Regions:
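Alpha-helical, largely C-terminal catalytic domains
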Residues: 1-71
Length: 71
């Protein structure tokens, strides 16, 4: 259902938001790349809430440029 897709998007977005808030600490500590984050959460978030994905996609690109990823 649409509600389930939205709930899944929210669940997938939370770890991304937390990592953005702590300047990518977990991503750096665990060697997580930008591509890996996008591959893991992008499709699910976009399917459930395209506006949220557009926002996160832009923030993830800023994080990549700032060197917040581990690999």
């Amino acid at each position: 259902t649409d509600d389930a897709r939205f709930a899944n998007a929210a669940d997938r977005a939370m770890p991304v938001l937390l990592n953005l808030a702590n300047n990518g600490q977990s991503w750096r500590e665990n060697g997580i790349s930008h591509a890996r984050v996008v591959a893991r959460v992008g499709l699910q978030i976009e399917a459930g809430c395209p506006a949220l994905w557009r926002y996160l996609e832009a923030r993830l690109e800023e994080a990549r440029e700032a060197g917040l990823f581990g690999a």
